[in-house]
């Protein structure tokens, strides 16, 4: 019997340190779960808490579904009614969660790399809790990145040579940053489009910026990004933002949809701004993978959580 190649990690905070083999193993494991494969048998209870300090519906719900499918005990956490509002630090909150017996915390936070203090405790600090990053500011979004890779792999069967366009509010998108790096490593050709004031030359090492209409007929994957108005408080372009004008220049409308190759897929991390990034009546079109991404997210998050269970030898796994 062939031995399963299973990933084992003490924390899951970024995709940058994952090898191509580990990414492949996570995709295979997620597809196994999706196809009805048995979940690992836990011989000891495992307690997990979802600590979302930024609004979320898809990611939060998806993680909780994944946790329950794996048989974990979910400990509720509501930041609006926590001692964070009294000035408690994230480290101290995590210390308390560790002390009461929580084994893993899934965290979304507005601060980039908030997890550094949690996974690298300073001298005389004894925090010992697994951390899964559900999104840090405009930094990384590993679970979204990996569910996107799963969705692409499910459709095409490979990454090598695929042409992928990342379109929209790139500077403020943690999804874009995770995906551009990993797609490049997996052999895809990455292109960028969208407002140039939301693009930085630091992304040139991953791909090439082009006007959208030049990319439309050539791409295999159109990865659309939400315009993140909540991160534009200091952006002078925000006050001049016009949704209709954005859609006309950077959105996928019916004309552009018809110009896509027959096998091209459209992806979006959600929530979709209808008639901004994508025409509203195309959200459930054949090429749009939005709901497929959400479905795959549950199974990929199961694979990610299992990797941390194994990495920390929780539930009797190793």
Swiss-Prot record:
Keywords: Pyrimidine biosynthesis, Transferase. GO terms for biological process: 'de novo' pyrimidine nucleobase biosynthetic process; 'de novo' UMP biosynthetic process; amino acid metabolic process. One of its GO terms (molecular function) is amino acid binding. Coiled coil: none annotated. It catalyses: carbamoyl phosphate + L-aspartate = N-carbamoyl-L-aspartate + phosphate + H(+). GO terms for cellular component: cytosol. SUPFAM superfamilies: Aspartate/ornithine carbamoyltransferase. InterPro entries: Asp/Orn_carbamoyltranf_P-bd (IPR006132), Asp/Orn_carbamoylTrfase (IPR006130), Asp/Orn_carbamoylTrfase_sf (IPR036901), Asp_carbamoyltransf (IPR002082), Asp_carbamoyltransf_Asp/Orn-bd (IPR006131). Pathway: Pyrimidine metabolism; UMP biosynthesis via de novo pathway; (S)-dihydroorotate from bicarbonate: step 2/3. PANTHER family: ASPARTATE CARBAMOYLTRANSFERASE, ORNITHINE CARBAMOYLTRANSFERASE, MITOCHONDRIAL. Belongs to the aspartate/ornithine carbamoyltransferase superfamily. ATCase family. Catalyzes the condensation of carbamoyl phosphate and aspartate to form carbamoyl aspartate and inorganic phosphate, the committed step in the de novo pyrimidine nucleotide biosynthesis pathway. This is Aspartate carbamoyltransferase catalytic subunit. It comes from Lactobacillus gasseri (strain ATCC 33323 / DSM 20243 / BCRC 14619 / CIP 102991 / JCM 1131 / KCTC 3163 / NCIMB 11718 / NCTC 13722 / AM63). The lineage of its organism: Bacteria, Bacillati, Bacillota, Bacilli, Lactobacillales.
């Amino acid at each position: 019997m062939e031995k399963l190649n299973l990933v084992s990690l003490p924390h899951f905070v970024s995709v940058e340190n994952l090898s191509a083999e580990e990414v492949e193993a996570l995709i295979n494991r997620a597809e196994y779960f999706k196809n009805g494969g048995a979940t690992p048998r836990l011989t000891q209870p495992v307690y997990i808490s979802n600590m979302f300090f930024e609004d979320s519906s898809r990611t939060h719900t998806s993680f909780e579904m994944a946790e329950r499918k794996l048989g974990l005990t979910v400990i509720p956490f509501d930041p609006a009614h926590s001692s964070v509002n009294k000035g408690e630090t994230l480290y101290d909150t995590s210390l308390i969660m560790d002390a009461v017996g929580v084994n893993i915390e899934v965290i979304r936070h507005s601060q980039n790399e908030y997890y550094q203090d949690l996974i690298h405790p300073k001298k005389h600090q004894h925090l010992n809790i697994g951390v899964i990053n559900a999104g840090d500011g405009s930094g990384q979004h590993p679970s979204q990145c990996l569910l996107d890779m799963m969705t692409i792999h499910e459709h095409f069967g490979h990454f090598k040579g695929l042409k992928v366009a990342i379109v929209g509010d790139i500077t403020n998108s943690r999804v874009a940053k995770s995906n551009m790096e990993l797609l490049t490593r997996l052999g895809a050709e990455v292109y960028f489009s969208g407002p140039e004031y939301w693009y930085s030359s630091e992304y040139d090492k991953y791909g090439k910026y082009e006007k959208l209409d030049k990319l439309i007929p050539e791409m295999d994957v159109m990865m659309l990004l939400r315009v993140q108005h909540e991160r534009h408080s200091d952006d002078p372009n925000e006050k001049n933002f016009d949704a209709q004008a954005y859609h006309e220049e950077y959105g996928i409308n019916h004309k552009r949809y018809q110009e896509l190759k027959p096998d091209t897929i459209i992806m979006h991390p959600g929530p979709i701004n209808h008639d901004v990034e994508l025409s509203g009546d195309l959200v459930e079109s054949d090429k749009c993978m939005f709901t497929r991404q959400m479905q795959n997210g549950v199974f990929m998050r199961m694979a990610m959580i299992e990797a941390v269970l194994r990495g920390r030898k929780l539930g009797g796994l190793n």
